[in-house]
Amino acid sequence: MLLAAGRGERMRPLTDTTPKPLLPVRGKPLMQWQLEALARAGVGRVVVNTAWLGPQIAAQFNDVFRLQPALNKHEQLSIQDSLQIRYSHEGQDFGAALETAGGIARALPLLCPPTGAGARAEVFWVLAGDVYVPDFVFSPAAVARFLAGDKLAHLWLVPNPAHNLRGDFGLGTVDTGGPTPIGLALNLPAADPRPRYTYSTIGLYRRALFEPPWCDIAAGNPLGIKAPLAPLLRAAMDNGFVSAELYGGRWTDVGTPERLRALNLNPPSAQP
């Protein structure tokens, strides 16, 4: 699920006429970087939620996103070149965005459709349409590892940027036995001195996190209930059901005109 429903208040006046995920970053709409990464990973379908200026997003990408032929021939032969897009139009249906958990609950029937014999898909990626993370790999191996465990969510954390020096979540003892060091995500008390990291907005989620007892919103969110994601995550963390790992690649929360300007001025190889 690609989150694209926010108003982008801090990005005004740019977002008065353009939804933040469509603002240009290094020659293409910001959310196109995520669509390309998903397509390169072989993800076949993405749900995009919209609210503020949502019709512009649907008009930009329509129902199918195809990779441009800029990749070399070997890459083109090894990846899926198109991505089916479904839209969850929160603004059209309810007049405003439903926040992250409310939006995911609204999109859940699209995210986890029946797979046959009454079964439903269990896990899905969630990522924001307003972060720049050009090197992230939506790894099928990460999905398989997540499916094999019992966690409700797995988060990618990043070092704290200047605008979020306090961070969001802690990271428990890291297991280095596998190919990627993984630990428990921690909901640390305010006085806890252990380091916190910033949630990158990229994560793997299990459908069960958005169902009772964790979430009381009905699948499809027919009443348009607004609900943030953080309380669900913190409750699951307190019960040991959220894992995390550190991501060290390029990552920018493109939240203000100044950050957008800096990103477009810096050379592509630079760490913003």
Where in the sequence are the language-model features?
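Catalytic-core segments of class I nucleotidyltransferases/pyrophosphorylases
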Residues: T115-G116, F124-W125, Y132, V137-A148, ...
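Conserved beta-loop-beta/alpha segment of the NTase-like Rossmann-fold superfamily
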Residues: V64-D168, T173, P212
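Short glycine-enriched, charge-decorated loop/helix-capping segments at active-site entrances
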Residues: D16-L22, Q92-F94, A218-A219
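Structural signal for short hydrophobic segments within the conserved structured cores
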Residues: L23, R86, R250-T252
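Conserved phosphate-coordination/catalytic loops
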Residues: V25, F94-G102, L223-A227
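N-terminal glycine-rich phosphate-binding loop and ensuing alpha1 helix
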Residues: M1-A58, P69, F138
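A structural signal for isolated positions on well-ordered beta-strands in alpha/beta enzyme cores
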Residues: M1, R45-V47, R86, W125, ...
